[in-house]
């Protein structure tokens, strides 16, 4: 029989109609001879009533066989419920069953198919097809589908062309680790799965496409955490002849449209802008969460003359004030914060409490001479807790930025209903890598340096600034973009600054340098992490919740057991041998 509608769509206006529904048994109850079934499908749950006085013996026998997650087809008439269930959209009606067919049976599931079930992540991923049956999971993927639909329509209406770029590309340096694919035909050679379509989308601008977009899979072989996966999806944009401001305006309009159409929220435009240096100095992060205060305070000059070498000899002394919550933190709690701080390079964590106007704590005696200045500077009051880090500026900022976020979560200081977007601009072009002992691109080596700082490509690389911009939401980097280099000599200077010889640059990027000899237009763009955006829209804290079949923290799939061993024949065809090292 043909399904009449989704179970979750049945309403009062359907009373009196005979309909056919199909779905899964969510729950079965026997009450006084009557059998009640909660039938679940993609759109919701509908109560079925099977009365032995109204159905044949065969139907009743079939109903008695039903168990959770059986797949069934039912026919019956829609009736008003004697007692409505306000918790269900279908709660005013029920289906009086006249016909019932079991389409498939089901084993007892390893966990209940319901929201809020407590089960390990690996079990959820092992039985992902069951996990995805849960209503909250389905809602997240409806939200994801709606988001991509809005984005496509918005960009289509602005004249962007949706173009697919290659999945098998060339491995290049200056990025995360590549996923490599061996070539059977060109033995000993490898493709790389793209970390982004960066170069190919730039070449589309050289081809005259003017406005490109793509919702595209990307791959990075990097350490995983809550908002990262080895394969992820990004909304990728590139434009020709537009300024930094014009590109940001397009992106803001797109985000505003997504927020309005998916959440019913009007966001204020334009988004605030914050310089990179201000973000680091005041929030201790290049992706600041502006939903709460507790900004970093620079006390370097104020404590320079005190008799406490940890402070007086440090490059930077910075602090955060936990207002009105000193009594929430015991010595043991602060010891835990200290261990947390050490993860970010801090040697320790100094602290004091304000109790009835007096300073208490291990360093209080050293601050007697600056007590009034410190009280005024930090606007200290009773029951305030002050946490200090004395170290390099970078360590102080990073440590206090992480503490700021941790404490705000511990104390429920964050308004979770807020969506605070902002642009972080005026980025440094390079960042120093302790591991590599050299400067590396803060974004990528195709970013345009500012006209005012480009001369430092042959001088002090720390002074080179980029025409780059990141869009941030609630402490997460949603995406990043920039204007790009479009002239060969500038691109060659950039490669030299990064330590490439002319031969290495030509070997890795010769095709791009050659393309720049054929009238490459000024261009720029941006990429937004779709998984991360949907995660935040859905109120989740892990992008696994909005990816249908994600990997776990070991980059493996407990369901399919990927990655897996392959046959000797496959390895022979690729001329590969596996060496095992103890």
Swiss-Prot record:
Q: Which GO BP terms sit in this record?
A: aspartyl-tRNA aminoacylation
Q: State the residue spans of region: Aspartate.
A: 198-201
Task: Provide the reaction this enzyme catalyses.
Answer: tRNA(Asp) + L-aspartate + ATP = L-aspartyl-tRNA(Asp) + AMP + diphosphate
Give the highest taxon in the source lineage.
Bacteria
Q: Which residues does the record give as L-aspartate binding sites?
A: 174, 220, 443, 484
Which UniProt keywords are listed? Aminoacyl-tRNA synthetase, ATP-binding, Cytoplasm, Ligase, Nucleotide-binding, Protein biosynthesis
Gene3D superfamilies given for it?
Answer: Bira Bifunctional Protein, Domain 2, GAD-like domain, Nucleic acid-binding proteins
> For ATP, which residues are the binding ones?
220-222, 229, 477, 529-532
Q: One Pfam family, short name please? A: tRNA-synt_2
What InterPro entries does the annotation carry? Answer: Aa-tRNA-synt_II, aa-tRNA-synth_II, aa-tRNA-synth_II/BPL/LPL, Asp-tRNA-ligase_1, Asp-tRNA-ligase_1_N, Asp/Asn-tRNA-synth_IIb, AspRS_core, GAD-like_sf
Subcellular location per the Swiss-Prot or TrEMBL entry: Cytoplasm
Q: Provide one Gene Ontology cellular component.
A: cytoplasm
The Enzyme Commission number assigned here is 6.1.1.12
- GO MF terms held by the record: aspartate-tRNA ligase activity; ATP binding; catalytic activity, acting on a protein; nucleic acid binding; transferase activity
PANTHER family in the record: ASPARTATE--TRNA LIGASE, MITOCHONDRIAL (PTHR22594:SF5), ASPARTYL/LYSYL-TRNA SYNTHETASE (PTHR22594)
Q: Its function? A: Catalyzes the attachment of L-aspartate to tRNA(Asp) in a two-step reaction: L-aspartate is first activated by ATP to form Asp-AMP and then transferred to the acceptor end of tRNA(Asp).
- How does the annotation summarize its subunit structure? Homodimer.
Which HAMAP family does the protein's record reference?
A: Asp_tRNA_synth_type1
Q: Which NCBIfam families match?
A: aspS_bact, PRK00476.1
The family classification in the record reads: Belongs to the class-II aminoacyl-tRNA synthetase family. Type 1 subfamily.
| Protein's name in the database | Aspartate--tRNA ligase
Species for this entry: Streptococcus equi subsp. equi (strain 4047)
């Amino acid at each position: 029989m043909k399904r009449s509608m989704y179970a979750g769509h049945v309403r009062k206006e359907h009373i009196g109609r005979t309909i056919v529904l199909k779905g899964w048994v969510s729950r079965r109850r026997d009450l006084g001879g009557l059998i009640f079934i909660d039938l679940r499908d993609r759109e919701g749950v509908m109560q079925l009533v099977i009365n032995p006085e109204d159905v044949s013996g065969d139907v009743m026998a079939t109903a008695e066989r039903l168990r959770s997650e059986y797949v069934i087809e039912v026919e019956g008439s829609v009736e008003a419920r004697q007692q409505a269930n306000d918790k269900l959209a279908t709660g005013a009606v029920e289906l009086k069953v006249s016909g019932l067919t079991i389409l498939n049976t089901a084993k007892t599931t390893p966990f209940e198919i319901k929201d809020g079930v407590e089960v390990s992540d690996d079990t959820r991923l092992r039985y992902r097809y069951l996990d995805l049956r849960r209503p909250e999971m389905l809602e997240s993927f409806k939200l994801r589908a709606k988001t991509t639909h809005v984005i496509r329509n918005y960009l289509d209406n602005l004249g962007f062309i949706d173009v697919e770029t290659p999945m098998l590309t060339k491995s290049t340096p200056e990025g995360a680790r590549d996923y490599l694919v061996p070539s059977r035909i060109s033995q000993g050679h490898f493709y790389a799965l793209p970390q982004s379509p960066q170069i190919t989308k730039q070449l589309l601008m050289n081809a005259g496409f003017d406005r490109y977009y793509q919702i595209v899979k990307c791959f990075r072989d990097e350490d995983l955490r809550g908002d990262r996966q080895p394969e992820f999806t990004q909304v990728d944009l590139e434009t020709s002849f537009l300024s930094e401001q014009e590109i940001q305006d397009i992106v803001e309009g797109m985000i505003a449209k997504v927020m309005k159409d998916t959440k019913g929220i009007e966001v204020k435009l334009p988004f605030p802008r914050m310089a990179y240096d201000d973000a680091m100095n005041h929030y201790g992060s290049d992706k600041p969460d502006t939903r709460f205060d507790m900004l970093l305070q620079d006390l370097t000059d104020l404590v320079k003359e005190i008799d406490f070498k940890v402070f007086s000899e440090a490059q930077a002394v910075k602090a955060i004030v936990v207002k009105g919550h000193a009594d929430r933190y015991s010595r043991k709690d602060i010891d835990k914060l200290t261990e947390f701080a050490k993860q970010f390079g801090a040697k320790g964590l100094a602290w004091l409490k304000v109790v009835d106007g007096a300073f208490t704590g291990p360093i209080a005696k050293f601050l007697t001479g600056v007590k009034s200045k410190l009280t005024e500077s930090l606007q200290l009051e009773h029951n305030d807790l002050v946490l200090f880090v004395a170290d390099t500026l970078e360590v102080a900022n990073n440590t206090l930025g992480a503490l700021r976020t941790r404490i705000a979560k511990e104390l429920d200081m964050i308004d979770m209903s807020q969506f605070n977007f902002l642009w972080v601009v005026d980025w440094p072009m390079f960042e120093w890598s302790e591991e590599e002992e050299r400067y590396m691109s803060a974004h990528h080596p195709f970013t345009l340096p500012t006209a005012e700082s480009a001369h430092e490509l042959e001088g002090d690389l720390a002074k080179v600034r980029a025409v780059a911009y990141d869009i941030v939401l609630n402490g997460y980097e949603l995406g990043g973009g920039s204007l790009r280099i479009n002239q060969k000599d500038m691109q060659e200077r950039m490669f030299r600054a990064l330590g490439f010889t002319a031969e290495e640059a030509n070997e890795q990027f010769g095709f791009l340098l050659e393309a720049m000899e054929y009238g490459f237009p000024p261009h720029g763009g941006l990429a937004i992490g779709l998984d991360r955006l949907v995660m935040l829209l859905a109120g989740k804290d892990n992008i696994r919740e909005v990816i249908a079949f994600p990997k776990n923290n070991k980059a493996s799939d407990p369901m399919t057991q990927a990655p897996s061993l392959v046959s000797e024949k496959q390895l022979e065809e690729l001329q590969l041998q596996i060496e095992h090292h103890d």
